Amino acid sequence: MDNKKKEENPSKSDTSISLPPSSTGEALQNYTESEWNASDDPYSAELLNVKKKPNRVNVFSATEKNMETIIVTEESPPQTPLPLKPVVEHHNLARLIQKSCQLLLDKTTPDGTEVQIKLEFPDWRDTA
């Protein structure tokens, strides 16, 4: 028993090694050879957290089913393209009217000048 206590104390100092913050990934704990040999038999992945014991090396064994990679390909059904919606650009129409009015008013004197613009568009929502 005294030998085990002596072995456990140095291992605690070994596991407190910290990695620099710039490294990526998960750091594995450093275990001595005796700690690896004292570990339990590997569990299935589903039981790994259930049977976990503190201060023990816990490993899991991959099942035959998990060891193979199965690639399943499916063909997606053809997608129908969406109908094109008419592009409504009200801001461009407003700019055209503004520039036309400005051009007409700049060429004439403001006294008695009256500008009337009438635009008629078919309702595009009725055709859909």
UniProtKB/Swiss-Prot annotation:
This is Uncharacterized protein C02F5.2. Residues 1-11 have a biased composition (Basic and acidic residues). It comes from the Eukaryota. Residues 1-40 are annotated as: Disordered. InterPro entries: Uncharacterised_C02F5.10 (IPR020149). Residues 12-37 have a biased composition (Polar residues).
